[in-house]
């Protein structure tokens, strides 16, 4: 085959480092080689020689080079990370102050007053928070406690453990006695057994609500707790006890203490199985809202008659939209989004609920004929999965009354997450579109609406006790703070945000921790505020680290870690409890399998006790964390000070600014001297 002369010339490839001019055979020794200038050489792309390799070697060569380049980038990235970490100041890591040793794996824990409640394989145990001694153990064969709640009622504590069968029991812990109130959802027929998913007890312990699931249905049972009757019966047992009644001896499967841990027991605490307390009063059952269907009303007048007294207004149930209109809208929707609807969709899980007990306020006023003690809940607020509405149910009802909502707060998007503050004064509703609605329930108006950054969606909300920054230190104001709130929001992308709102000013959102892009092991898994330390939160990361962050300064103060033999085996789901009254928290340490023995019965599990006051960096913060309100008022409203104080403060601030610039300081003092001389001359003339 012949080619044109021109095309044959174009296909000539120069070797690397070829010379201009005629080719010469170099001498056999380097001494005789001519010393040419760099201009006499033609630099050719080295890749041209690689491209000349035949297949499949050319592709293999490119893949090897690509793999080498990627490996080199990873090596450089790791080296840069090591250099950055070595240059940064690592936070001080504090070990635990105490340890609770267990023979069983602790599944859950709760802290209330001076007690720790730990749920395990055969029930739950009660420990002293400071001495780490077991004071009582309630255990039942073949029952694993998977979750536990403890509510402080002042002198009493309500304990609610849930076992692996989903049965929730309500216990009353008073002085030296533990009393079983009721097994809320226990039935004789196991085929009809329901499962408790969630529970909530009102502030003060007057009401309790239990979210139950069974037979493909889900609902909320609400009870009124006769705590005054319980207290009266236990304080005056001689008035209610029957001396002729025989006490039944506990059997093998009855409720009773079966100690399994070789720890010191407190003989004063015991289970009072012979004393029967009054049962909770069942007041209502709440089911998820029905799907919106075509109207059954024949005229708009029937609709208005249905919603008299404004009950249920805004829920979308009582409307005048016909089935044909719904079908027409469904056809339009299916035609517009057909390519998305043709996919295989997973079956939607059962709807669940989030609910709170709300105190009387401007929004929830109790009827005049109803007289209740101050601080007693009057309304139950609830929202269901994929629902736009936040429903309000009055607690002033009986079982005969129909469980219709007294109020509805509709939102623009389905409510994904919500949270009520510990004081029940503030409520945050986070929708699926990333919009937060902040409510001041005590005053009865919204604090504002804030939107998370684009791509961020709320995962959990954690309220902080309101604090102020005074002289560079976080302080709690003395007295009650009104219409001011702060909370941290953990998003689904593991970013952490601080949300602040004050009065009529719009809420602000600031980023505390950015979304991890390269180092996924630093992903935040859980966040817990520390009430004993103003503006502090515990951050649990995927790599097992536990850090304490100051949200005002946006920096890590210190870190906490269990001993090396007890790492966090499941760091993305840590088991911990923060005390609401004391400067401490508890963390479960998972036993290391590397050091485990062949005998599983000899394995010891531990719950570690960390005290913030034992840390040198934190010991002064928890002891001096309050500031008088007058100091904050002086800082916030300097115009309220006398004229002399205001002038003195102004001169002090000006002097601090001048210290940074010596030239301006000399000029300023010279001007003051001239002014003072002129004032003296005027006085002499007078």
Swiss-Prot record:
<feature type="compositionally biased region" description="Basic and acidic residues">
    <location>
        <begin position="29"/>
        <end position="40"/>
    </location>
</feature>
<keyword id="KW-0853">WD repeat</keyword>
<dbReference type="InterPro" id="IPR036322">
    <property type="entry name" value="WD40_repeat_dom_sf"/>
</dbReference>
<feature type="repeat" description="WD">
    <location>
        <begin position="410"/>
        <end position="449"/>
    </location>
</feature>
<dbReference type="InterPro" id="IPR015943">
    <property type="entry name" value="WD40/YVTN_repeat-like_dom_sf"/>
</dbReference>
<dbReference type="InterPro" id="IPR049547">
    <property type="entry name" value="WDR93_beta_propeller"/>
</dbReference>
<dbReference type="Pfam" id="PF21030">
    <property type="entry name" value="WDR93"/>
</dbReference>
<feature type="region of interest" description="Disordered">
    <location>
        <begin position="1"/>
        <end position="40"/>
    </location>
</feature>
<dbReference type="GO" id="GO:0022900">
    <property type="term" value="P:electron transport chain"/>
</dbReference>
<protein>
    <recommendedName>
        <fullName>WD repeat-containing protein 93</fullName>
    </recommendedName>
</protein>
<feature type="compositionally biased region" description="Polar residues">
    <location>
        <begin position="1"/>
        <end position="10"/>
    </location>
</feature>
<dbReference type="InterPro" id="IPR006885">
    <property type="entry name" value="NADH_UbQ_FeS_4_mit-like"/>
</dbReference>
<dbReference type="GO" id="GO:0045271">
    <property type="term" value="C:respiratory chain complex I"/>
</dbReference>
């Amino acid at each position: 085959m012949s080619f044109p002369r021109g095309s044959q010339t174009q296909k000539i490839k120069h070797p690397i480092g070829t010379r201009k001019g005629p080719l010469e055979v170099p001498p056999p020794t380097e001494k005789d080689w001519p010393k040419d200038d760099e201009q006499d050489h033609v630099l050719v792309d080295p890749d041209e020689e690689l491209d000349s390799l035949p297949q499949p070697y050319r592709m293999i060569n490119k893949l090897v080079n690509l793999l080498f380049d990627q490996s080199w980038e990873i090596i450089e990235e790791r080296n840069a990370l090591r250099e950055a970490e070595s240059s940064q100041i690592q936070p001080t890591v504090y070990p635990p102050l105490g340890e609770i040793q267990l023979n069983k794996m602790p599944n859950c824990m709760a802290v209330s007053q001076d007690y720790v409640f730990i749920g395990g394989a055969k029930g739950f145990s009660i420990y002293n928070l400071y001495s780490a001694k077991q004071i009582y153990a309630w255990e039942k064969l073949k029952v694993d406690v998977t979750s536990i709640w403890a509510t402080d009622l002042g002198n009493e504590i309500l304990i609610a453990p849930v076992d692996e069968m989903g049965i929730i029991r309500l216990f009353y812990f008073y002085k030296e006695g533990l009393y079983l109130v009721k097994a809320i959802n226990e039935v004789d027929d196991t085929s009809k057994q329901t499962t408790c998913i969630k529970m909530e007890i009102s502030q003060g312990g007057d009401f309790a609500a239990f979210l139950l699931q069974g037979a493909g249905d889900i609902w909320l049972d609400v009870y009124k707790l006769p705590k005054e009757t319980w207290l009266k019966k236990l304080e005056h047992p001689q008035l209610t006890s029957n001396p002729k009644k025989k006490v039944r001896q506990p059997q093998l499967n009855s409720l009773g203490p079966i100690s399994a841990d070789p720890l010191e027991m407190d003989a004063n605490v015991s289970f009072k199985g012979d004393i029967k307390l009054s049962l909770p009063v069942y007041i209502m059952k709440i089911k998820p809202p029905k799907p919106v269907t075509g109207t059954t009303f024949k005229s708009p007048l029937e609709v208005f008659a249905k919603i008299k007294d404004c009950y249920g207004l805004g829920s979308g149930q009582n409307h005048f939209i016909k089935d044909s209109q719904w079908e027409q809208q469904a056809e339009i929707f299916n035609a517009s989004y057909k390519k998305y609807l043709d996919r295989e969709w997973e079956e939607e899980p059962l709807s669940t609920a989030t609910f709170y007990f709300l105190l009387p306020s401007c929004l929830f006023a109790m009827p005049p004929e109803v007289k209740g003690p101050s601080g007693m809940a009057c309304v139950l607020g609830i929202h269901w999965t994929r629902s736009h509405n936040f429903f309000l149910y009055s607690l002033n009802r009986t079982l005969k009354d129909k469980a219709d909502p007294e109020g509805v707060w509709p939102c623009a998007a389905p409510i994904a997450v919500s949270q009520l503050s510990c004081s029940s004064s503030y409520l945050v509703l986070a929708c699926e579109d990333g919009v937060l609605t902040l409510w001041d329930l005590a005053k009865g108006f919204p604090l504002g609406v804030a939107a998370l950054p684009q791509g961020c969606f709320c995962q959990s909300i954690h309220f902080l006790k309101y604090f102020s920054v005074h002289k560079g230190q976080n302080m709690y104001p003395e007295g009650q703070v009104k219409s001011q709130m702060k909370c941290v929001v953990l998003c689904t992308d593991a970013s952490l945000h601080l949300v602040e709102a004050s009065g009529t000013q719009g809420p602000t959102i600031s980023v505390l921790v950015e979304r991890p892009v390269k180092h996924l092991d630093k992903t935040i898994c859980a966040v817990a505020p520390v009430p004993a330390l103003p503006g502090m939160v515990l951050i649990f990361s995927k790599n097992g680290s536990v850090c304490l962050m100051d949200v005002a300064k946006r920096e890590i103060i210190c870190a906490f870690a269990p001993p090396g033999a007890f790492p966090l085996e499941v760091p993305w789901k840590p088991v911990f409890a923060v005390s609401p009254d004391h400067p401490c928290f508890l963390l479960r340490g998972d036993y290391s399998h590397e050091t485990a023995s062949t005998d599983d019965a000899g394995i010891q599990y531990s719950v570690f006790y960390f005290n913030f006051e034992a840390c040198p960096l934190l010991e002064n913060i928890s002891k001096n964390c309050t500031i008088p309100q007058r100091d904050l008022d002086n800082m916030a409203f300097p115009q309220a000070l006398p004229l002399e104080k205001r002038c003195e403060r102004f001169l002090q601030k000006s002097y601090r600014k001048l210290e940074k610039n010596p030239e301006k300081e000399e000029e300023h003092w010279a001007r003051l001297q001239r002014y003072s001389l002129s004032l003296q001359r005027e006085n002499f003339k007078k």
